């Protein structure tokens, strides 16, 4: 199965399934002498791991990462970094009733059509469980970026029709919704409780931001920085749309409104472009927004077919997120970090 490696110089290859024994990743191209320990990675994994609140899946995975190669005496050696996480809370029996059925809205049907076989236990490789290794790799990328003064943060900016204003960045990691607005917590709680009571799910918008970048990252024309970001974000489970800067709002704008004017004293006067012009970073904040679809794993019956092509009805049992976008925040941060560290290393190689 191809398509499991991301990056050009700083590469990440992942493997593992939702109900398999373990998840693993190989990170190659990491510079040497970067201080790194398991605790550095665990900090990011703890933000993504399931079972932390009543508003996400109740599957409880400690997601304890082990570094098996590429680090010696607390520093990277420049050789491939191997990471592994053991799965510990699989309940495969929850999926026994759908082993011959395709869950509507899931990858069951397409995986079976492509490979002639599928791991029906929690979606196998198509499960968002795989993203734990992306977050682990992203933690390493973040350490490198921090050395260059680059910071990445994300937040949930909309759940369903509830739009959430950005008020306090420091509050993002102090609540289970990754929102930047303390006053919006009760509304988020009520919404998720209502959705869960209905046996349904809801979509979300996640905004991810990178600050402290230099101008000049990105390689026109097919390796534009915004194209690389969109490619990375669209590889995340349940993401159905990605926009940069003002995104789709620019459709209703005039050129006189949208263009980011520049002055000698103040620099850029606005950032409608989201920090990228012509596929190259401007040095402003990079801003991307992701639309997460509502998960198809719900308790309401849905029409589908089985492997023989017969009509059937599916009710997805098991433990699932009522809103997958909530836990998508650290995943989006990780993917942006992987894109930027790769582009940074590529740009350095050009200049050297």
Curated annotation (Swiss-Prot):
User: Would you say which domain of life the source belongs to?
Assistant: Bacteria
Is the Transcription keyword given for this protein?
Answer: no
Q: Which example biological process does GO assign this protein?
A: aromatic amino acid family biosynthetic process
Q: Which reaction does it catalyse?
A: 5-O-(1-carboxyvinyl)-3-phosphoshikimate = chorismate + phosphate
InterPro entries associated with the record: Chorismate_synth, Chorismate_synth_AroC_sf, Chorismate_synthase_CS
Cofactor entry: FMNH2
Which Gene Ontology cellular-component terms appear in the entry?
A: cytosol
Binding-site positions, FMN: 125-127, 237-238, 278, 293-297, 319
Per its UniProt entry, what is the enzyme's top EC class, as one word? lyase
**How the cofactor binds, per note?**
Reduced FMN (FMNH(2)).
Alphabetized UniProt keyword annotations: Amino-acid biosynthesis, Aromatic amino acid biosynthesis, FAD, Flavoprotein, FMN, Lyase, NADP
A family per Pfam: Chorismate_synt
GO MF term list = chorismate synthase activity; FMN binding
Q: In which pathway does it act?
A: Metabolic intermediate biosynthesis; chorismate biosynthesis; chorismate from D-erythrose 4-phosphate and phosphoenolpyruvate: step 7/7
Q: What's the subunit arrangement here?
A: Homotetramer.
**Entry function:** This reaction introduces a second double bond into the aromatic ring system.
Protein name stated in the entry: Chorismate synthase
């Amino acid at each position: 199965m191809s398509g499991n490696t991301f990056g050009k110089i700083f590469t990440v290859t992942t493997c593992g399934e939702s109900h398999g024994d373990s998840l693993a990743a190989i990170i190659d191209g990491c510079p040497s002498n970067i201080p790194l320990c398991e605790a550095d990675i665990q900090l990011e994994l703890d933000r993504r791991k399931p079972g932390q609140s009543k508003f996400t899946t109740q599957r409880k995975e400690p997601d304890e990462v082990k570094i098996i190669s590429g680090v010696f005496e607390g520093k990277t050696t420049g050789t491939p970094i191997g990471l592994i996480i053991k799965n510990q809370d699989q309940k495969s029996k929850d999926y026994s009733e759908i082993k011959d059925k395709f869950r509507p809205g899931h990858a069951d049907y397409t995986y079976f059509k492509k490979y002639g076989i599928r791991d029906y236990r929690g979606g196998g490789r198509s499960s968002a469980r795989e993203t734990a290794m992306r977050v682990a790799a992203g933690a390493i990328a973040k350490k490198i970026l921090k050395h260059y003064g680059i910071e990445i943060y994300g937040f949930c900016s909309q759940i369903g029709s509830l739009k959430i204003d950005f008020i306090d960045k420091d509050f993002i990691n102090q609540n289970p919704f990754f929102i930047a607005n303390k006053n919006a917590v009760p509304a988020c709680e009520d919404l998720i409780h209502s959705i869960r009571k209905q046996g349904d799910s809801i979509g979300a918008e996640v905004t991810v931001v990178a600050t402290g970048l230099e101008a000049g990252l990105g390689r026109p024309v097919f390796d534009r920085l915004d194209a690389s970001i969109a490619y990375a974000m669209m590889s995340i489970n349940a993401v159905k749309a990605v926009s940069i800067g003002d995104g789709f709002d620019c459709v209703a704008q005039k050129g006189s409104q949208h263009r980011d004017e520049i002055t000698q004293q103040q620099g850029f006067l606005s950032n409608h472009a989201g920090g990228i012009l012509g596929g190259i970073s401007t040095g402003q904040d990079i801003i991307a927004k992701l639309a997460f679809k509502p998960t198809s794993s719900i308790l309401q019956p849905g029409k589908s077919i089985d492997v023989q092509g017969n009509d059937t009805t599916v009710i997805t049992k098991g433990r699932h997120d009522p809103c997958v976008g909530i836990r998508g925040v650290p995943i989006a941060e990780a993917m942006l970090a992987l894109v930027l560290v790769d582009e940074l290393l590529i740009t350095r190689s050009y200049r050297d």
